[in-house]
Amino acid sequence: PHPTPTPPFSTRRFPPLQVRIHGSGETLLPVGRSLVANVQQTSDNGRVHNLGTSVPFEVKTLVTPSVLRNQYNWPESAKGKHGSSQAVAEFYGEFFSNHDLDSFFNEINEPQQSIAQANVKGNLANDQDHAGGEASLDVQYLMGMAPEVPTYFYSYSDLNPYTPENEGFLTWLVTMGGEQNPPLVHSLSYGDVEADVFNSTNGAAPYAARVDLEFAKLSARGMSIIVASGDDGSAGFLARNDPMSGCSHAAPEWPASSPYVTTVGATQLATDGSSTYEIVCSAREGGVITSGGGFSDIYSRPVWQKDAVQAYLKNGVGVPKASFFNASGRAYPDITALGSRFLVFVDGAQVELSGTSASTPVVAAMISLFNDARLGAGLPPMGHVAPFLYQTAVSHPNAFTDISEGSIACLSGSPETVTCCDDSFGATKGWDATSGLGSPKFDQLLKIALDTGKKQDLKQNFKHAAKLVQSRRSTQAEALEPHSA
């Protein structure tokens, strides 16, 4: 089966910040691999069906940085001042254009920032004449939401040597691990089918385990890896390849399912006529894509999310039948944010993009600004963010907006033709497998992140990451060396 790349979301533009290109090749999300579902299917068992028509109260306003700031109580004054840094990782030959960045900032009325000449490293130069949707989306919204935070562009042509249709994440991670001061926050909008990545018949599993080791090592150094949850609901690419049988069991995505990263889902705006609110992003409701989520078939549930996930399973609302998923696995997403109908400039044109590829750089930018504030207060960076989020949901539940409407039963596509599964996960009060802990309230989370009492909590997160490194090393005596395709 093909990997499940997370497609770019709504259009977006970023202010021209200091962008440096690293790696063996400039690439971004594989825009050439369409994630839009145009297939109508029915099954003799009723497992797959087309549900037609979109929700009558869909909000079609394009999402821009100002919309995001208003939605999440995110002040315009939040900018980089104290040494924070951030980056995007791109594969499959995605490029971005500085001209598009300029156009984006002009469109959103943001003051343009001076941009240093991009430092291109590797075997692929940034082909600005062929800017792609994924790269443009990632760079524009990471920079647009975290102004004046130095931003880096890591691009690679490498592929997984065992499953060459998948990304070569290891080269990227080892490159960062070898840097003295790598960026503190990394936004990753790519994903593959977990079962393919951990295929025991082709030797791929040790490669994935080595990638996890590098994730854990970076977390132990204070870095945050923010990953998109996917754009084809809970059944993912398996249902797209074989709708008749693909809906019989959830198809977790990786590295979204990894406990060593923080995973981001997507929401869309809806209205009841008097107010606008967020619901789970679903193609059936006009959201273009359906946010990914579910439970890993490989990883056991980490202790930091045990109580939240167990409450969801015990409640039973929005929980599919037991045979559909691994109820003891690592559950995702951890958090969510708007990911439908983003305004983006691509190759000189203003376009609209949707996906968890949009919500992920938004959350990554938020963490970059939290880091900047912490560094200014003499505190360490956030590191692995997921444990902090779950701790905060217990101590300060109002720091999140609970998303209690929607499901992830469908693939991506148009409301009239999208394929949907009968079994899936639904939204409910508290953590759920469609939207995690909910969407963030920037102002409240920032205050909590700056709370001096959290300094010790984050140190505990670092210690936890260090233990994970030791554990991974003990099981990976023959750790693979990075492979360049």
Predicted regions and their residues:
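Short glycine/serine- and small hydrophobic-enriched flexible loop segments
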Residues: A364-D372
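Secreted peptidase-domain scaffold signal
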Residues: D422-G426, W431-R472
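Substrate-binding/charge-relay-adjacent region of secreted/lumenal peptidase catalytic domains
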Residues: P1-T263, S296-S354, R374-A377, L437-K454
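An often Trp-containing, charged/polar helix-loop segment at the C-terminal end
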Residues: D272, A322, N371-A433, N461
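Long, low-complexity, intrinsically disordered segments
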Residues: K467-A485
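Polar, glycine-rich mid-to-C-terminal structural blocks
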Residues: P259, T263-Q305
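Hydrophobic/aromatic hotspots within intrinsically disordered, low-complexity regions
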Residues: F9, L35, F462, L468-V469, ...
